């Protein structure tokens, strides 16, 4: 890299940094920004005499805004050096002159906060700011429920940590903002930062923020280990994450990293890495600091789940109900080991809300098995080559005229090939008839060769239907035919789910099965509407579907031997007739607790109200627990629940 190119990249990095930290309006993904900073560092290490004083590597990002007073930290708040792989970790440890006794914990992706306590009372809270001076957000800090306002330590002390928003709460916040036509937060970190810097403290309160301490600033503690400091801080009443440990050497650090990375999707809040620091405080003092980082700690970053790429086109997909779904075609990008080439755009209202165009740079996020989605459009990076995404008039599959209902655009042709194929794929899927071996590609192949053309035709398949088809040999054919035969004996609720009735999912199908048995499709509007959890919309959908398809369901009954699940309910226990809400992370899947509660005659609701009898909560319980406490609903942990069900 030449000096001129280096200075251009310094200017670009500063532009991205100001947009991110000062305006909460990022112009690039974290991965893009990190890569740019690493390029600058490589040049600076090789050209120490040409380092620009304006380089972001030489300063802490400013976040001071005019709406809040400035407040000086008693001791500087440092950022951390990033390392991205084993070789970089070992290089950092070598520079730190330490290869044993490391303290490690998750690096939560939130907003840093500095709390000052005097005489055991919380007196102020401030953002990191430029490291020396932050924003005074004390009034908002007092609205964060899990921050102790009084502690059993009378000396002056700064306690530092990360403010996060749980993933579930983040989704609810964005759902609410969408209804109000407000811009959506790109990620939970931006939401946490924005929530802390509200002029209206009631908004901060309703966001259900969580604070996790990771260190101290000014203090008079006499501990010799950082682990001892953190144990003391948590004993004062602060939250502690389950994954905090001491590692004897770097091999243990690497093992812990792999373990934590495997927990990434299960954690209720976002993590972007693992903090690794020297545990010996005397050695930390000896090592000191660079111009920007402590030498005794580093952030061992996870692979990015969010990256920037370009939207190069839009494909239209036709669902089994005829709804047209636009899918973004992307320049391929590697997200956590998976090459992502497309992302959902949901519907054309979402396209309008995002104001996304073909050739835009966009930020794409992938989480677990969730379909990748676009979280942000970088409009400031437009080059004049962008093209509008127009609403379709004709079905991309059958070319029939589409019905435009505003949010939804539908193909009304019931013989549309994509509608039929997707209906069959849904019918045989795991949560429906669960026909092993009859996956999406096989369904498409069989439909293409006219071996299956309706849902019913699946059960008329014979051995010779598969002969000559690519990939089908005797064993595979017999296995598939056996799986189809086994599916004839499926539970009634699975069959109802498989029919793909609008608004009727697995839970509603179970309710219909248990309430009406095989006569479920012969009921009145009132009978449907009176079912718990059902409403007018679901009842209307059922009435319309069963009116049109009653004869067809009768024919299915001749093909299938459907089983009705019977729930044996214990009616004399303390749980009988009680309503539970489950929240947080428990030792076993929620479905197991739900099944036990229902077996004992209780029921499980998805929301807390005055009619709720118990809230069963686990680790990182969210807003449901807070609401339960406000309504004075009895809250029990897993241990108390186990005692309750023993009675």
Swiss-Prot record:
- Which BP terms does GO give this entry? DNA repair; DNA replication
Residues engaged in binding NAD(+) = 30-34, 79-80, 105, 128, 162, 301
Q: One Pfam family, please name it.
A: DNA_ligase_OB
Report the NCBIfam families cross-referenced here: dnlj (TIGR00575), PRK07956.1 (NF005932)
Q: What function does the entry list?
A: DNA ligase that catalyzes the formation of phosphodiester linkages between 5'-phosphoryl and 3'-hydroxyl groups in double-stranded DNA using NAD as a coenzyme and as the energy source for the reaction. It is essential for DNA replication and repair of damaged DNA.
User: What family is this?
Assistant: Belongs to the NAD-dependent DNA ligase family. LigA subfamily.
Q: What is this protein called?
A: DNA ligase
Which organism encodes this protein? Campylobacter jejuni subsp. jejuni serotype O:2 (strain ATCC 700819 / NCTC 11168)
